[in-house]
Curated annotation (Swiss-Prot):
It comes from Xylella fastidiosa (strain 9a5c). This is Protease HtpX. Pfam families: Peptidase_M48 (PF01435). GO terms for biological process: proteolysis. The gene is htpX. InterPro entries: HtpX_protease (IPR050083), Pept_M48_protease_HtpX (IPR022919), Peptidase_M48 (IPR001915). Its EC number is 3.4.24.-. The chain crosses the membrane at residues 5-25, 33-53, 155-175, 193-213. Disulfide bonds: none annotated. The lineage of its organism: Bacteria, Pseudomonadati, Pseudomonadota, Gammaproteobacteria, Lysobacterales. Induction: Constitutely expressed in rich medium it is induced at 37 but not 28 degrees Celsius in minimal medium.
Amino acid sequence: MLTRIVLFAITNLAVLILASIVMSLLGVNPTQMSGLLVMALIFGFAGSFISLLMSKAIAKRTTGAYVIDQPRNLSERWLLDTVSRQAEIVGIGRPEIAIYEGVEINAFATGADRNNALVAVSTGLLQNMSQDEVEAVLGHEIAHVANGDMVTMALLQGVLNTFVIVLARVVGGFIDSLLSGNRGGARGVAYYAIVLVLELLFGLFATMITMWFSRRREFRADEGGAYLAGRNKMIAALERLGINHGQSTLPTQVQAFGIYGGIGEGLRKLFLSHPPLSERIAALRVARQ
């Protein structure tokens, strides 16, 4: 956690320095933009962290997940025991375990605190995977929790949101001044229209950056699953996903933390939260050699 906070502070400082440089190049006095920077930080991080803090409740509600408090059968008992053992190995508190109705083979982890997270699996996963494969999937999700991926993603999204808000308004003001000759005066409708377009454009680039990081994070979680359950089991689980693949039906709020994120071609690949299964399997096989 301390490492992520330090990295977060350094990244924010870099964003503010870069914003100041951009403003200077565009002829904007950075000292007059302090209000914008404060506003951008507040709005940039508010949504990310509110979503993070509410992520468990949102995930349970949107998927209709049933949390296993007392196991009703041997399968649920095995799930609890397996997750407890894996959580102990990586040194985190045991997450809540839940099952949600879904024909697709998938699972996800979420939560703001690595010692109070949620791991959920679909009924489709339990019905179509062997116990070894399920163990590997659980290890993958436990690795997400242990790595603090949910917090890291929220921090990254907050930084990018801040950058988008600041840059759209600075560049928008510069363009508006060029078009209208209005330098430093009251802004008209054109300025706000330009800012809206720039926010959409910069937001697309920010999403691409977030999804690129998410794809890198999946390789690390696969390695975690291989460590906790065994490399062959992790490879077998991913191969099973490849046989039963399709578009992910998980809610958007938790899709990035599922074991499987769907497929895409061309430019759509840039907006996928997960790498192709073939690349993930190849990475595990190379690491085994």
